[in-house]
Amino acid sequence: MSKVVIRTKYSSNGKSVGGRFTNYISRRDRVDKTINARRSEVFPKYAAERPGVITMGEHGLFGQEDYVNLHKASKEIYNHNGIVWQQVISLRQTDAERLGYDTPEAWRNLLRSKQFEIASYHRIPAENMKWYAAFHKEEGHYHVHFILFNKQPGGEFLCARDYNRYKDSLTKTIFKDEMKQIYDERQSLRDKI
């Protein structure tokens, strides 16, 4: 069983989201070099429209609501004065396909089912957490770009212990059938002893 990989970074306010990311996307060989957006719009736009994204309508961005307006989401992040986390949650392609995490709907359902738990790991009151994500089918590793923040900034952070709990929680959910099979096999061996 492989594991879930989570890369996480944050910006102290929405205006700087995409600052370092701008260099990253401008160096990607498959990215349209003519992107001329405000820094705040770069990350959500990149996540929602880059090559490899699986769209759900006009773009690939999804969130807590059924429909996400990309322009409105970008403005919301730009005007946010607190911490904005930019995360990439990734699975190996073979695992994603085998376990059914090869569609945006599967990832949306996973993130929606875990949103209150994720909020608690980041020290965000559940009712104040806001998030957006986009699923990318990149060769070798399928992943979601996950943007989250506290609508009422103050007190949010992610310590190493909670990062590990967050990762373990996603791993246990994604690989639950495989884990059950392993536990059942172990129990069967114990019963034979």
How would you name each of these model-derived features?
Residues 1-193:
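N-terminal nicking endonuclease/strand-transfer module with a His-rich metal-binding environment
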